[in-house]
């Protein structure tokens, strides 16, 4: 950026005249003053005050004497002073002129190098200002990109996701309630089915008992019919016997009538037989009526019992058919409820799978958006750091430029001072004793205080202290 040269080979005229300047060095390729960088680039930081003390030693003669600046060497160069009316020492003037020309040549070279360095600094400052403007435009562009829009989109998407999650949660809760209701209905139907099965078993048991009663009644009826037949046979037999007896009695009566006719003194047997017949007929009629009444009562009882059993059997069969129809309807309803439950469970699993996939997709979108936001924040922070670093560099360069400007102004004033002194010099011849007595050294200490705040020069103060040696 600037040409480097060794400080041991070249010594600045400023150093040779004013001594070492505190805080900076002109011998380095990029001679920049050493400033504390703390506080630059930080908004609201405390102001920093930089003080520089320049020691200027000037050798002044008597009235109208030649004043030369003090060199940084151990010895002090004392220029001879010429009084009025004395002879001019041309060899000394020639030496002074040669030294002045050499000094001017070195100063010209150093000023050219300083100009080159300042040109490079100006180019660098211009380049940094361009970069600073580009970064400022980039920062403004990033600020104008509406970062809140991303937050709004994020919040809107989050609200939509929350709404969908709430809808799915409500649907799942409703499906759970329906499933619980179906499970309760299924349990109730199962309990009712068990009750109906128990009732059917009781009806079947009653039917079996009724069947046993019917069988017993049938057997009793058959027995009674058999007994009726036997009684009818017995009645027929008794009738036959009775008829035989009647015939026998009639035959006997006829024989007795014959004997009566033969013997009128014998008792009347016809009346006795008639009485006996009447008695037997009465007894037979009574037995027949009693047998018929008993048979009729037994037949009516058996008929009533059979009718009751038939009614009970018919009612049991009807109830069994109703129970069978109810069982079939309940079985169909249970199958339908099982199918509905299976479809609801399948829908619930599908909803859960879809909800899980959508939730994972939303989580991926959220992670991607958060990663983009983090990336944008990191990029913005990086641009801000670069902008801050460039701003710090610019402030430091502004301070260095201001310092070099002050140094150049001081150097120009120092260069112009010997020319004016040399032009106003009255050459006169003096003796070495007079020159030695008139030469005295005047030391000037310049204290310059520069106060900067946030990289800008706020105030400057310069104090000079004169000391005669």
UniProtKB/Swiss-Prot annotation:
The modification Omega-N-methylarginine is found at residues 16, 37, 70. The modification Phosphothreonine is found at residues 17, 76-77. The modification ADP-ribosylarginine is found at residue 58. Pfam families: Filament, Filament_head. Residues 151-251 are annotated as: Coil 1B. Residues 268-286 are annotated as: Coil 2A. GO terms for cellular component: cardiac myofibril; cell tip; cell-cell junction; contractile muscle fiber; cytoplasm; cytoskeleton; fascia adherens; gap junction. One of its GO terms (biological process) is nuclear envelope organization. The modification Asymmetric dimethylarginine is found at residue 37. Residues 2-108 are annotated as: Head. Residues 437-452 are annotated as: Interaction with CRYAB. This is Desmin.
